[in-house]
Amino acid sequence: MLTADALDQADALFDFFSGHGINNVGFNMEETEGENAQSTLERPDGERRYRAFLERLWQRMSERPGVMRLREFDGIASLACSDERLQNTDMNAPFAIVNVDARGQVSTFDPELLSVQTEAYGDFSFGNVLQHSLAELADTPKFQRVLAEISSGVERCRQSCGYFGLCGGGAGSNKYWEHGTFDCSVTQACRYRIQLVADVVLAGMEQQLGLVA
């Protein structure tokens, strides 16, 4: 989990992981979500520091190839080296993920939405696994409202964002917690998870391939 305090520790983190033989690493970002009303990464210098953090990790990994792989770098690099582009994600496609709580209440889209209570939507339970089929859940007014807003938000991303093929329209929970609605586009979470990572990876690949002076 990366917070603002971690952004000055790229060398320490690389040395720790490589020194302990941990060669596959993935970072989760501190997000504005649920009880965490504000991420420390939202500070004014957060994006600059995060980019510098990623650039330093890229440099260290390039100096010692094979010692450590970073999930975030691998994901962007694999898309950049192929013709594949994302059209959506499991977290904005209905029933790609099915979430069931201890009472049998069923939600879909982001797992983070299960059991959440909100003023605008109530909770995000669409029915009960013991009483309803998925087809019945999909026919409820609440599900149709959430699906319509998530789909509209994905389309906003598709039409306005040059990173869409790397992101697939983002995660509904991030949009809701940051903007109060699913029907919106860019989030701070996407800036950190996709956009800034893509900028660093593509710049690093171009340099390694001799495509820049």
Give, region by region, the residue ranges found by the protein language model.
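Flexible mid-to-C-terminal extensions adjoining Fe-S/redox cofactors in radical SAM and related proteins
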Residues: 116-213
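Radical SAM enzyme [4Fe-4S]-AdoMet core and its adjacent flexible, acidic
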Residues: 1-106, 111-129
